[in-house]
Amino acid sequence: MMQTGSVTTPFGRRPMTLALVRRQTALADIKQGKTADKWKVFRDASAAMELLGIQSNSLAVLDALLSFHPETELRQEAQLIVFPSNAQLALRAHGMAGATLRRHIAMLVESGLIVRKDSANGKRYARKDGAGQIERAFGFDLSPLLARSEELAMMAQQVMADRAAFRMAKESLTICRRDVRKLITAAMEEGAEGDWQAVEEVYVELVGRIPRAPTLADVESILEEMWMLQEEIINRLEIRDNSENNSTNAAQSEQHIQNSKPESVNELEPRSEKEQGAKPSEIDRARSEPIKAFPLGMILKACPTIGNYGPSGAVASWRDLMSAAVVVRSMLGVSPSAYQDACEAMGPENAAAAMACILERANFINSPGGYLRDLTRRSELGKFSLGPMIMALLKASGQGTLRFG
């Protein structure tokens, strides 16, 4: 029968802690009749090794301990204390050195996977009754593995999910890096308008921030910024294409007018867009395209000054940023109507972000109100993106030498 209802303290100089007390008392709460396959539990513990704070040698010791339990299943009503000597345990742990063995036993105890059941003299043994059944044993109690079987399974699933997410994020980052690199190269080689050298520097800086051994959080953070850089590049190239198409269409229209014979005075008078046969959806398409909202964290990194004007002197949410933008608007002398127009054209979040950018370079902008109106006008025409402002501020952070406009 399984021994329950008692708390034993470690033999010798090993200290007793309240954590050990809690772990031992929790064993009494194992559900009546509960069972678990010991090797499945071992596989789950192996998968969750890093979360448990143990090492591969710790798993070798745990594997050896489980091999001393005669049954495949861990059962609530069974005897779950194993009592091998250090020599026997070291042999089954592939000849592990004594000092290493003791260190990893301590790690298994500390992680809550096993519990010591020390005898009065520290020896490991079992006392049997007249029928040869184990009456009492001293050694290592495996019942925490049974008690935590569901928890270990969930930890293993989480680790596998994180690994899958990490693989996908790394794959996405690799593809995005390739796309951005080739887009920049194409723009440079084909002489696209714009400061592509600066864009390339942003790309190189992003790649340089990838750690040698990145975590999932590292990859996701860089990937998000790389995606934004890719979108900004595509946006610049699309604006260039649209500008070229508009210039071509305008030239063709002018040539058509010059080659046509007007039949009435009305043909020389300005007409409305509807009179000219233009489709409203085409006219308003640029105005209806929403400006991409950048992550709040990136905006605050590029424009740290805005944080001083948030509620309680900090900006922790988009609502805080919009509140701070209203304060800054008044402080910089931007009229309510100019800011309202910006909110309608860009959206309130992007208008607040634009105010944060203007504040960050207020010393270099002669008329903040006029500057905001210019951004609003460009936004209405579909020719404005926050990307260049934010990327430029990130690059120039601490230098104070950049001008916009």
Curated annotation (Swiss-Prot):
Sequence segments annotated as region (Disordered): 245-286
Biological processes per GO annotation: DNA replication
Skewed-composition ranges (Basic and acidic residues): 268-286
Pfam families named among the record's database cross-references: RP-C (PF03428), RP-C_C (PF11800)
Keywords: DNA replication, Plasmid
Biased amino acid composition, Polar residues: 245-263
Alphabetical list of InterPro entries matching this protein: RepABC_RepC, RepC_C, RepC_N
Function text: This protein is coded by a hairy root Ri plasmid, it is probably involved in its replication.
Name of the protein in question: Putative replication protein C
Natural source organism: Rhizobium rhizogenes (Agrobacterium rhizogenes)
